Amino acid sequence: MLLALTGSTGFIGQHLVRELPRRGYRLRVLLRRPTSLPTNTASAVIGDIARPRNMSAALQDVDAVIHSAGLAQAMSGVPEDDYRVINTEATINLARAARRAGAKRFIFLSSIRAQCGPTADTVLTEALEPSPTDAYGRSKLEAERGLAELNIDWVSLRAALVYGPGVKGNMAQLMRLARSPLPLPLGGLRARRSLLAVENLLAAIETVLATQETLRRPFIVADPQALTVAEMIAAMRRGLGRWPNVFWFPATLLEHSFRAAGRNEAYERLSGSLVVDPAALMRIGWTPPLATEVGLARLMQAALDRDPIQLNRITV
């Protein structure tokens, strides 16, 4: 099967470039400008996904497109129109080009933020009405709605926070916290959050590629087990061969401490729940190969093996 991939230089894209050829797929990487690939097992084609008519040749003979490119959530100061142009319009343009080229399926790597804000009071499923709260989430949801109007078999994977070797952002901050030698007073935080191992995302993509039925829908995707922040820290520290060293402390006092220090946003990230139910994807055959606690332990071990000094320099 010949796959076309966008976003090959991003965190998720780099994993896909490396792993998909190992699993027997032929890979054609779509690049905006010439650049070196991390592997010689993929061919590269230069093109601009914002100009779909220029992409027809690049998508010739492709069986499916995996669209991973886009503006990331954590980019501060980006106007909403930029999110719409890059995350919405370019996605729809690429899907149109894929349809003209005869691709059988279009896989859009979306985000759980197309479904909700940074936290949610209920377990999320695809049956709930989406209510994104920022420009990033709205741009992803608008892209899905645009795909629904096209005559192509599309799938949107609304991924929870993805983690794996090389991850940045909020997960990198949590890694730094776990790397600290200090005991942490996080045991009183009972909120749970769903995460997604990059290996489990790859398995989800393979499931969608192998499915014969027409899909044309979004799927929420996350590791089946949601963890508290204390459980995440404990799993990471076990990956370093250390005792978890997380103790109970009243959540209200912890909140007062954070707010007194002007760290309101940091506390919200630690204390807010966001739990999703990936049962719909599992019903079409997805079996995530990696448990969250195992994945987090491996994440820390990989970071330590790769660069023990750099692990200490992850910036909060």
Language model region names:
Residues 207-265, 297-301, 306-316:
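Mid/C-terminal beta-alpha module of Rossmann-like enzyme folds, strongest
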Residues 164, 186-192, 219-226, 235-241, ...:
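Glycine-rich Rossmann NAD(P)(H)-binding loop
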Residues 138, 167-173, 187-210, 216-220:
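Substrate-positioning beta->alpha
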Residues 85, 118-163, 167, 184-187:
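Catalytic helix-loop patch of NAD(P)-dependent Rossmann-fold dehydrogenases
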Residues 3-23:
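N-terminal Rossmann NAD(P)H-binding glycine-rich loop of SDR-like oxidoreductase domains
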Residues 92-135:
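Conserved Rossmann-fold NAD(P)-dependent oxidoreductase catalytic core, especially the SDR/UDP-sugar
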Residues 36, 46-92, 97, 114-115:
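NAD(P)H-binding glycine-rich loop region in Rossmannoid oxidoreductase-like domains
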Residues 198, 231-234, 258-288, 298:
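Conserved C-terminal active-site "lid" loop/helix of NAD(P)H-dependent oxidoreductases
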